[in-house]
């Protein structure tokens, strides 16, 4: 076995590889950028080498620096993780040229599967079913439009070198094709350095099912069953499971065999994933092959009991596959939820900032957390905003869903937006619970998933106020004078009456406590609520409320209190005299940047007339392109940025004047 390997990646996947390497007695070398100098993968590795500035193009995508780091440290092999250089044939070739083992497939296999158009031609020869479409080399815009017209709408424009949901556009009308093509090519060029695209018929209500395959240098191939990755936002997976529920067994077997045929067709070695787009009747079409380990590989590990990173290392070292096909079986059901720093209610835009509080669920044989993030870490604009992957196992799908709901209820994040509450609602959603799965599930259920009730139970408001009251009492046990009155958000009067003032969602909340026996009577919104409480620690309130004893998790900051209950979080701000509740969205006449990024297109100038939904400019953030659109028919008063400019979240991009209604 290897004595030392270098991991050419960061975050949770680097930590994941290090964990298995340690188990096998293999020394590890991490690489890091400026932003990652104190990252967990750097601390976990035996050695760490600095490779450049924070932008990935100046660090994690620098092939020469990574190769040199491996040579300088004596690493015999490089594990690429996923993303970054994991599917880069030039990187694999550089490893080969420097006598370093690339822990992945041969260069020829990466080349064959790296471009969607090329891979589809190979799969057609191998008898693997394909979605109807155009996969050729002619990239003339008018020609591609004609192909789309011939295929029939809706169609998908897909970057030939794409992946991860990037470089993809759904086009439903012929007149929208050329603008969508330009946007797709721009994103593909920025993300992959290759603007070639292919056109495919869009399958209505498709499922996204993938098969995990492995090959070795001895000509052996196996599959480790399938994963359903249908639940997606922005064409990116967010909740995955294994095995795929409610699929006919004969259809699954056909997919599994097609996946092995695909791997064999390119003499594949190592871990690979063959992805299929699946119609509701179970008919499957080859979509692409990912020549690397997938983000969602843990669900396969949970149902098979296999360590796929260990398989990768053994196969790369020249050993045969650890198991033959007849030795692999499915045990139970597993789910993976990707916990992101993002704002689901704002179109899932990434959230940037510091994680002020982080509590992971307790891990066990049934609950696993893969992460490279700890409390105090920054989520930056440079990399993917994933906080962690939460993976659960149950004896069946129903048990796994229950386990996931419970684990999400123990997963607490504060300091920046996150999708935990969204994930919990997703798990509880009837469509998901009943396995009515397709890639449009989130959009179809957005009323339930993205627009939770703004109402909040009085008991939670009173509990938040009680935490503030008890915190001040703990800090000031026997006050000699009413110093608490100096606080703008609460006060104590001479009749043992305590008033706490909070704010939630712009609404002022006033809660008055009067002492009674061992607890308080809280007056709020016309209700009288008896409550007793004790701070168990800095993040737990033990309380007796409405005759029930319970514990409530919370976090506090200088700005306010966040309560965590049943997968949901409830944020309360301290009410201050100088509180200024500014609209984050700007006014209709002032369009602002939803997040930090780079302006990639400016399509309007001052005095231009535009129609509602016209794209005014595009903003790229984390390699995803966002369109800034006109909210109404109107005139551009001013455009404040040019192509290539960096913008911050909240920067005013365009001053927009709606057209006055025409008088008849």
Predicted regions and their residues:
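Short acidic-glycine loop/turn motifs at beta-strand connectors
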Residues: 173, 215-220, 279-282, 362, ...
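Conserved nucleotide-binding/hydrolysis modules and their immediate coupling elements
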Residues: 307, 516-519, 525-540, 544-550, ...
């Amino acid at each position: 076995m290897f004595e030392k390997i270098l991991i050419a990646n960061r975050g949770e996947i680097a930590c994941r590889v290090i964990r298995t390497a340690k188990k096998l007695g293999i020394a590890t070398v991490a690489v890091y950028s400026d932003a990652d100098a104190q990252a967990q993968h750097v601390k976990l590795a035996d050695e760490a080498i600095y490779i450049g500035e924070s932008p990935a193009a100046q660090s994690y995508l620098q092939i020469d620096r990574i190769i040199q780091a491996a040579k300088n440290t004596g690493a015999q092999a490089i594990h690429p993780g996923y993303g970054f250089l994991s599917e880069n044939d030039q990187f694999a070739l550089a490893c080969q040229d420097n006598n370093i083992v690339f822990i992945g497939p041969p260069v020829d296999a990466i080349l064959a599967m790296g471009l969607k158009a090329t891979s589809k031609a190979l799969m057609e020869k191998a008898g693997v079913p394909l979605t109807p479409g155009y996969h050729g080399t002619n990239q003339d815009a008018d020609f591609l439009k004609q192909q789309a017209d011939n295929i029939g709408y809706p169609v998908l424009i897909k970057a030939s070198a794409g992946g991860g949901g990037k470089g993809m556009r759904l086009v439903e009308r012929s007149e929208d094709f050329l603008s969508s093509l330009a946007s797709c090519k721009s994103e593909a060029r920025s993300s992959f350095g290759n603007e070639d695209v292919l056109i495919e018929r869009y399958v209505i209500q498709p499922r996204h099912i993938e098969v995990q395959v492995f090959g070795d240098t001895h000509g052996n191939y196996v599959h480790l069953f399938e994963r359903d990755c249908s639940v997606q936002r922005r064409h990116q997976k967010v909740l995955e499971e294994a095995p795929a529920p409610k699929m006919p067994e004969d259809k699954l077997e056909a997919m599994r065999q097609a996946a092995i045929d695909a791997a064999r067709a390119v003499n594949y070695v190592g871990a690979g994933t063959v992805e299929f787009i699946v119609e509701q009747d179970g008919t499957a079409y080859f979509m692409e092959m990912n020549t690397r380990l997938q983000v969602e590989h843990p669900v396969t590990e949970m149902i098979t009991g296999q360590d796929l990173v260990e398989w990768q290392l053994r196969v790369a070292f020249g050993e045969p596959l650890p198991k033959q096909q007849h030795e692999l079986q499915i045990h139970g059901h597993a789910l993976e939820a990707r916990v992101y720093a993002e704002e689901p209610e704002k179109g899932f835009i990434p959230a940037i900032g510091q994680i002020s509080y982080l509590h992971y669920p307790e891990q066990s044989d049934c609950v696993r957390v893969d992460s490279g993030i700890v409390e105090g870490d920054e989520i930056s604009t440079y990399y993917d905003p994933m906080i962690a992957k939460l993976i659960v196992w149950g004896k069946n799908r129903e048990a796994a869903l229950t386990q996931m709901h419970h684990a999400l209820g123990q997963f607490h994040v504060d300091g920046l937006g996150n999708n935990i509450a969204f994930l919990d609602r997703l798990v509880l959603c009837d469509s998901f619970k009943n396995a009515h799965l397709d890639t449009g599930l989130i959009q179809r259920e957005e009323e339930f998933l993205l627009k939770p009730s703004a109402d909040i139970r009085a008991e939670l408001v009173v509990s938040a106020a009680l935490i503030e009251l008890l915190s001040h009492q703990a800090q000031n046990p026997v006050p000699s004078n009413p110093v608490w009155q100096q606080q703008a958000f609460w006060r104590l009067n001479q009749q043992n009456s305590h008033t706490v003032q909070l704010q939630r969602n712009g609404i002022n909340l006033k809660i008055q406590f009067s002492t009674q026996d061992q607890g308080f009577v809280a007056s709020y919104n016309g209700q009288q609520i008896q409550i007793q409480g004790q701070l168990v620690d800095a993040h737990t309130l033990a309380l007796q409320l409405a005759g029930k004893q319970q514990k409530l998790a919370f976090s506090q900051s200088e700005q306010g209190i966040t309560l965590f209950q049943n997968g949901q979080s409830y944020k309360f701000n301290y009410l201050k005299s100088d509180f200024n509740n500014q609209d984050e969205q700007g006014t209709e006449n002032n369009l602002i940047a939803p997040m930090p990024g780079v302006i990639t297109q400016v399509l309007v100038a001052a005095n231009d007339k535009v129609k509602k939904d016209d794209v005014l400019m595009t903003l790229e953030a984390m390699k995803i392109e966002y369109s800034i659109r006109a909210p109404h028919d109107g005139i551009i008063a001013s455009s404040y940025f040019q192509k290539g400019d960096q913008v911050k979240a909240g920067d005013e991009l365009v001053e927009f004047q709606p057209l006055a209604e025409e008088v008849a």
